[in-house]
A protein has these predicted regions:
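Classical eukaryotic N-terminal signal peptides for Sec-dependent ER targeting/secretion
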Residues: 1-8
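C-terminal and inter-domain tail/linker signature
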Residues: 5, 14-156
Length: 156
């Protein structure tokens, strides 16, 4: 009898997990309305997948709008251009350390230390505009800490 209840509990937990997976959309784009809490959770998921786990081909199509607007002077707008750019980052030779992040009123930001083999570390800030569930616009600024810096405070 005890194994019967254990089997029922196992199947119930498996069904709950499968339902949770099925309720998560394949993509958050095109944009759909989202509460502030939903938007925060979606942004946290994007940071984890794209920045921390460096799973670009999974994260970018899920979180970036096809008509994504890019303000970086060295990159063109569009989701595919983001994927092409991120393909240059080898996860084995670049490390992104999230220092701070936040989201408020459809604006999200992240401050990170970026270390790439053969280069000095960078302080890197990304700013995004979200439309509901979807990232639709980006600004980014990065800078190395110069060797002759006079400010003793750390960059990151």
């Amino acid at each position: 009898m005890r194994s019967f209840y254990a089997t029922i509990a196992f199947f119930a937990s498996t069904m709950t997990a499968l339902q949770a997976e099925q309720t998560q959309p394949a993509s958050y784009c095109p944009p759909r309305p989202a509460t502030a809490e939903e938007q925060r959770a979606i942004f946290e998921q994007a940071v984890q997948t794209i920045i921390v786990d460096q799973q670009y081909t999974e994260g970018v199509p899920r979180h970036y709008d096809e008509g994504y607007i890019q303000h970086d002077p060295f990159l063109l707008s569009g989701r595919q251009n983001v994927l092409d750019y991120l393909a240059n980052f080898d996860p084995d030779s670049v490390n992104f350390t999230v220092i701070n992040k936040g989201i408020d009123n459809n604006r999200a930001w992240i401050f990170q230390r970026v270390e790439q083999v053969g280069s000095e570390p960078l302080g890197w800030v990304d700013l995004w505009r979200m439309n509901g569930t979807c990232i639709v616009e980006h600004w980014g600024v990065s800078m190395p800490k110069p060797a002759d810096a006079i400010n003793p405070l750390p960059l990151w």
